[in-house]
Every structure is written in C-alpha cells, then in structure tokens.
Swiss-Prot record:
Its EC number is 5.2.1.8. Pfam families: FKBP_C, Trigger_C, Trigger_N. PANTHER family: TRIGGER FACTOR CHAPERONE AND PEPTIDYL-PROLYL CIS/TRANS ISOMERASE (PTHR30560), TRIGGER FACTOR-LIKE PROTEIN TIG, CHLOROPLASTIC (PTHR30560:SF3). HAMAP family: Trigger_factor_Tig. It catalyses: [protein]-peptidylproline (omega=180) = [protein]-peptidylproline (omega=0). This is Trigger factor. Belongs to the FKBP-type PPIase family. Tig subfamily.
Amino acid sequence: MSVTVETLENLERKVVLSLPWSEINAETDKKLKQTQRRAKIDGFRPGKAPLKMIAQMYGASAQNDVINELVQRRFHDVAVAQELKVAGFPRFEGVEEQDDKESFKVAAIFEVFPEVVIGDLSAQEVEKVTASVGDAEVDQTVEILRKQRTRFNHVEREARNGDRVIIDFEGKIDGEPFAGGASKNYAFVLGASQMLPEFEAGVVGMKAGESKDVTVNFPEDYHGKDVAGKTAVFTITLNNVSEATLPEVDADFAKALGIADGDVAKMREEVQKNVSREVERRVNEQTKESVMNALLKAVELKAPVALVNEEAARLANEMKQNFVNQGMADAANLDLPLDMFKEQAERRVSLGLILAKLVDENKLEPTEEQIKAVVANFAESYEDPQEVIDWYYADPSRLQAPTSLAVESNVVDFVLGKAKVNEKALSFDEVMGAQA
C-alpha cells in the first residue's frame, strides 16, 4: 500500500486514500441485496421487491454508507502499515481533483502523538512540603469540632458578636425598595460576615422588639450590580437573640464523634489519626503539584489539539454534572465555552503524555500491593473499611482511580530521587487553610 504521509502544521498530517470504484460498487451491490431481503414495499411481498427499485430508492444512501465504511477501514490499514500513532479522530475531506476515473479519493487529516523526550530531571527544582500534627493541632481541631456543634439558647439581653439573631428588615435606596432588600425572620450569626459590616454593626446592641434605621454603603464591587456603589437605609426589627453555647469536651462529646464508650483520650487519638491522614494527603498533593510543574518544564511538548479539545469537552461536561448534582437541573443544557477549559485541558493532556513516557521508560507501573495500599487508605476513614475495600474489588473498573494514584505516587518518588529537592515546612493552618 503506497501512501504518502504529508506533514502539515505542528502534529497535523494528511494522507490521500484511494478507493477503487470497483470495490465501492461491489460493496454497494452487496448492501442493496441485504436491503432487498428486509425491505417491505407496498405491492410486493416482504423481500420480493425488484433490486432495480431498491437501488433507485436506497442506492445513494447505500453508496455513502459503503464509502464511509471503506474510508474508515482504509485509514486504519494505512495507520497500521505506516506505524502512525494517531491522536484523536481523523477528519475526512473530499479531494477536488478526482483525476483517476478508476478510484474515488478522500483526504484524511489527523494528528499524531508527539515524541516525548524527558529532559535532565537533575536540573529541575522540586518543593517537598512537610507538616506535623501534635497536641496543639489536635486541640485546634477539637475546638473546630466544638464550634460545629454550637447550640444557641434564647437570651433576654442586647445582641453581641457571636449571637444568632432573627430579624425583619426592609431596605430602600433613595426612598424606593429594591429587589432582595427585604426579608422577615432572617437568621444569621453576628460577626460571621454573613451580612455587610455596617449592617451587622447596626444590629449589635439592639434588644428583641427594638427597631432602628441603619445606613449601609454597598461596595463598588458588590455582587448585586443594581445596588453596587449605592447607599441604602435599612429599617431593622430585632425579633430574637440567642447566645452560642459550645459543648464541653466530655464523654457525651466523644460519643457524638463516634467513640462508643465516650473515652476522651480515645477521641483525641482518633482526631489525631484523621487529621494526620488529611494533612498527609494535602502535603502530598502540594508536593505532587511541584513535581508535575517540574516535569512540564523538563519536557518541550505540543499537545495534540484533538486531545485537548476532547479533554476540554470532558471538563465542561463534568462541571455541568456537578451543577446538576447541586440541584441546578437546567445546568445540563448550559452552553459552556470550551475556551474556559483549554488551559487546564492542555496541562492534563501534556502531563498524561509525559507520565506515560516516564512510567514506560522507568518501569514505574504500580504493584498489586501498592494499589491495595491506596484502596485501604481510601477505606480507612469509613465506618466499615472492609465493606469499602470489597466494593472497589467487586468491579475492576473501580480500581482505575486507585491505580492512577499509585502511578502518580511512583512518579513523584522517582522525580524526588532525581531532582534538586527543597524541603518546605508548613504550619498546620497553612496546610489546612484558615478554619475558625
């Protein structure tokens, strides 16, 4: 099969496929005869309509189907014969100059995978993040857990920061009400930044049953464009004040966190274990991000446009599905521009190609034991870890995510063993983010 592969721009290639008319016609005749056997046409018994009539009715569509099938088959044969590593799907175009009456020509335009050459990893710098979890971090986490279980009790006094208040309010701009500017029995916690600072400051010091006018200046960058940069006067009536009460760290508190016998020491051990696991996950993610950035620097790579577009479309669909899962039913019909996802898609495709090369060259495929360790780590935070492990192993497709993580872990370890590693110790707050 003599076919010339023409190089276009970057990774794009072109081949012209010749389909003999004799083959097209023979395959078309075969398809029409198959159609004849199934056809139900008025005036004829099933399968007994004349072939000539079948050809008149279905000949054009049958020939198009045959040409499409032959083009796909011929392109596959050419790709195998020429050892072409095709990325994505080809597009087929008609050839204007059909100079050979014996055959029909079609141009196949496609991309090939780039050659991936891993650069000198010893020249790359990688940041390895570390963090520790001690008694202070456990205390901090327990305090967060206490705040999450705050109870509010009604009090007869003026409102203070930290109280939950229930109010009626109506806002006006230049004496006129505005959309979203009024509500009844609206509850919020003072000092939690749920409302604008001037609004909250106006409520502090009020008692149940009191009303007052509070002037509020909306910021220029306020999310409500109709009121951004404007001044409103809110008439506020305070209906109820409730004081926050945090639970004591005792047996009842420990039981609420899943410690059956209420042992506070066991609870702290469990908190430390869970927090340590989460801290480890986060520092590993940051280290992995640094490793991936180093790999992108070490490899000059142009990702195939077809694969980038496919990944961008997948990311768009993923975002729409997330919206749907959050209750936005109409999100499935959103027309999200793929350009929103192109940068992320290009990074993912490039890293996929680099990792595949690195794993293949350095035999970094994970062992069964490594995959089992990842699954066990997933399961550890659940009430019945064995049930979770059994779920993963009940369907081999469910092991794809653990396998990918095991591969990435091997890659990270490999790069850390080659690159210049700078250790960076982070505090608990830096790792976990600000948690009040």
